[in-house]
Swiss-Prot record:
The lineage of its organism: Bacteria, Pseudomonadati, Pseudomonadota, Gammaproteobacteria, Enterobacterales. One of its GO terms (biological process) is cellular response to acidic pH. The gene is yjaA. This is Uncharacterized protein YjaA. InterPro entries: YjaA.
Length: 127
């Protein structure tokens, strides 16, 4: 089972695979002055490309059962006062689209501090 930790900042997404310890980052203009993710499709494409760098698809993947991931997303900026339901939904939908909904667990962390690998695992164990 793969665990992905996704960190979202203004116009930047970083994805870390806790199993392989690999990390990739991408930049694009998806934020504005009010929303961390203002351009949904741009953010989804950046995240999809990053996930594919960590977990490339092959022809064989279409014949095998889907590998489900556990995902924690950190909104590291523009999170003062917590996230609204709309902002949480945006994060959920971006991840769902980028991963083709291939996840078992999904958690949102809305604080400015980056989580350690052990903190991510602890969050997933809480369910």
């Amino acid at each position: 089972m793969s665990v992905l930790y996704i960190q979202i900042r203004r116009n930047q997404i970083t994805v870390r695979d806790l199993e392989s310890k690999r990390e990739v980052s991408g930049d694009a203009a998806f934020s504005n002055q009010r929303l961390l993710i203002a351009n949904f499709f741009v953010a989804e494409k950046v995240l999809q490309d990053l996930v594919l760098q960590l977990h490339p698809r092959s022809t064989w993947h279409s014949f095998l059962p889907a590998k489900r991931m556990d995902i924690v997303v950190s909104a590291l900026e523009m999170n003062e006062g917590g996230l609204s339901q709309v902002e949480e939904r945006i994060l959920h939908e971006v991840v769902a689209g980028a991963t083709l909904m291939k996840y078992r667990q999904f958690h949102i962390h809305a604080q400015s501090a980056v989580l350690s690998d052990s903190a991510v695992m602890a969050m997933l164990k809480q369910k």
